[in-house]
Amino acid sequence: MSMSRAELQNAASRAFGDANLAPDAEQSWQLIADMGWLMMTVPEPLGGLGLGAEAAGVIHSELGRALVPGPVIAQMLVIEALAAADQLAERDDLIARAMGGEVMTASLGGSGAFACIPDADRATHLLTIDANRIALVPLEGAKMTPRETWDKTRRLFDVVLARDAVRFAIAEGDAAAALASRLDTQRHFALAGDSLGGAAAILALTIDYLKTRRQFDRPLALFQALKHRVADLKTQHAAAEALFWSRATGNAHAIDMAALKALATTTYRTVTEEAVQLHGGIGLTMEHHCHLFLKRALLNCALGGDADHWEETAGRHALATA
């Protein structure tokens, strides 16, 4: 199947463009499954659309633009891992269920106790990821504790697996290390897309506000100091977005994708922090939509390693390979 980036963007915009920001979690998740977005990157022989990383980038960007809740990133990690599990007898059935919308979530690493698991209370399975073993574990009998977070568009849980939990082995040893690296790369790319979509949305809302809000009988958008601030934000976002789409070929080195995640999430944070200021007094009220974007930006910065960590790692890698 072939579908252009513009066609995908139009489809996603029609689905969520007219909705309120941060739509209902259950309804939006069902819509995501019905639209087939969970099967975007799954190879066609496994029942997917086989559209590749660019299609996934469009979806993550548009979902971030509308602040759509739900464990889309985690679900896609699960599906990607299952697609690589050639020896798992239950693979095809599990992939079909995941693509159909049965919630399966993923950890960021470790074993036994897991922190910050998206939508664990709705999930039937948890993908456990580390460098030595990757497995899918049913969540029956697991202990789940909601984690308080500033981002109200997403729900995170700390999970302790049951002692007798059955594990569906996906990869071990060198194969697990290679797959874990690929999943890390996919997660970085997804978070970058979510961040740049959100940054574009709040920047557009801020520009609209500056055009309509008047002071001294003039729209705020005519004040040169404010125009320069917005132009700087637009330039920063455009540069990050250009890098994002250049990485959508799927051939980027893992460290390059981590650096992209650091740049995109930092851009998102900068844009949202400036948006709060540019909205003036109303932007400081907790009920204003600026804070929905700001808090999502802050969580995106933290997930999977913050910008300082990845920038230092990328710098060391560049020096070592120079």
Residue ranges and their predicted role:
Residues 33, 269-294:
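A glycine-biased, small/acidic residue-tolerant capping/turn segment at secondary-structure junctions
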Residues 2, 17-26, 207, 215-218, ...:
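C-terminal helix-coil-helix/basic helical segment that borders enzyme active sites and/or dimer interfaces
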Residues 1-72, 315-322:
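Amphipathic, small/basic residue-rich leader segments at the start of a protein or domain
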Residues 192-224, 228-241:
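Oxyanion-binding "anion nests"
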